[in-house]
Amino acid sequence: MAGHSKWNNIQGRKNAQDSKRSKVFQKLAREIFVAAKKGPDPNLNPSLRLVMDKAKAVNMPNDNIKRAIDKAAGNTSGENYDEVTYEGYAPGGIAVLVHALTDNKNRTSTNVRVAFNKNGGSLGETGSVSYMFDRKGYLVILREGLTVDEEEFMLEAIEAGADDVEVSDDVFEVFTEPGAFSDVKDALQQAGYTFATAELSMFPTVYNEIAENNQTQFDKMMEALEDDDDVQEVYTNAEIN
């Protein structure tokens, strides 16, 4: 993964995401609600624990998290969401995976299709691009204020069960197998580290650089997808410079 830092890609769109923080919290609340329907105790519900870690890493207020859990525990309205994944291509052959939580599949399918079609992309069949991605645990630790050197941290992370560590001037990026994610996170947390990002995510096996003439359409497609209330995550194999 060297040279293809997910953190760089995150930072590449960070300003736009910061301006939509309330929408990020709204989507996380839906994800917490769905996970909490399997049980309100994160110690007994790994799915809830994962999404709570994700929410805390982006500074979602504890009150918001608690409200979503309480809503699930007291849900008598029949409110329910289905998990749906869409696959396709952005302009220039960039692979795109869209994960959604929806209470109306027809609405979401229509909105996602429009976002692709209006911006030079095309939706594909199930399996058309998912084989290009691997699911991994992902932890980001900001280096500011840390005294640990690169070799020492890498040894700590590997001993905790990490598969790989990437180092840059600003951050340590830690990658794990999905099943080892919680154990690695807990071990590093107990060692005193805090996380700027803590999540299970999808990573491209091969990256694809966006041609300059496709950049505007690509950006518009990403904005349209991320603005959709039903869309939880958008993954691409675009290399963002």
Swiss-Prot record:
Sorted alphabetically, which SUPFAM superfamilies does this protein's record hold? YebC-like (SSF75625)
- Where do Polar residues bias regions lie? 1-14
Residue ranges the record marks as coiled coil: none
InterPro entries, from UniProt?
A: Integrase-like_N, TACO1_YebC-like_2nd/3rd_dom, TACO1_YebC_N, Transcrip_reg_TACO1-like, Transcrip_reg_TACO1-like_dom3, YebC-like
A molecular function (GO) held by this record is: DNA binding
**Where would you find this protein in the cell?**
Cytoplasm
Identify one Pfam family in the record. TACO1_YebC_N
Q: What GO biological process term is on the record, naming one?
A: regulation of DNA-templated transcription
Question: Which domain of life does the UniProt lineage start with?
Answer: Bacteria
Q: Which GO terms describe its cellular component?
A: cytosol
Tell me the keywords, alphabetical order.
Cytoplasm, DNA-binding, Transcription, Transcription regulation
* Region Disordered, annotated ranges: 1-22
Report the family membership.
Answer: Belongs to the TACO1 family.
Which NCBIfam families is this protein grouped with?
Answer: PRK00110.1, PRK12378.1, YebC/PmpR family DNA-binding transcriptional regulator
- State the name under which the record lists this protein: Probable transcriptional regulatory protein lin1570
Q: Which organism is it from?
A: Listeria innocua serovar 6a (strain ATCC BAA-680 / CLIP 11262)
